């Protein structure tokens, strides 16, 4: 939005551009466990128990229109879930070179290193790293990682 404002876009044009880009905006969250998602009513209790018992980790993503959180990938252990999740991100980067990627965590040093390795040599704009905000962190808990990516805004001037 800031780049659009600096580009001389009106508020209505900026809103329209952002709404048009939403289908290509992705947010993938990999919590260590589903415990907090269960506590907050975002995941069924049985799913939380089974994933914990079977050492399965899920990557979840919000459905933009409904607001529901959907499981989109699964894997056993950090390496497998990050590899499975990053496959989508890397395919997106192949299709949309120069896209923005941002990585946020609530710890998750191992997962962050795996994501950095996957992104090495890719054509993307690093939109930064940092902590997951407190609202999302409440839902995903400690040692979670979030990967967001979307096409980069192309100025008209």
Feature roles, as predicted:
Residues 2-157:
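Mixed-charge interfacial surface used for oligomerization/domain docking
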């Amino acid at each position: 939005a800031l780049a659009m404002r600096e580009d001389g876009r009106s508020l209505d044009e900026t809103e329209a551009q952002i709404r048009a880009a939403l289908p290509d905006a992705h947010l993938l969250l990999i919590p260590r466990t589903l415990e907090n998602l269960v506590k907050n009513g975002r995941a069924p209790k049985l799913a939380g128990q089974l994933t914990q018992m079977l050492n399965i980790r899920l990557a979840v993503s919000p459905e933009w229109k409904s607001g529901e959180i959907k499981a989109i990938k699964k894997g056993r252990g950090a390496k497998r879930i990050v590899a499975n999740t990053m496959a989508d991100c890397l395919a997106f980067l192949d299709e949309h070179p120069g896209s923005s990627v941002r990585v946020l965590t609530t710890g998750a040093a191992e997962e962050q290193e795996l994501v950095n390795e996957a992104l090495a040599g890719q054509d993307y704009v690093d939109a930064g790293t940092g902590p997951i905000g407190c609202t999302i962190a409440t839902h995903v808990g400690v040692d979670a990682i979030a990967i967001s990516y979307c096409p980069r805004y192309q100025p008209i001037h």
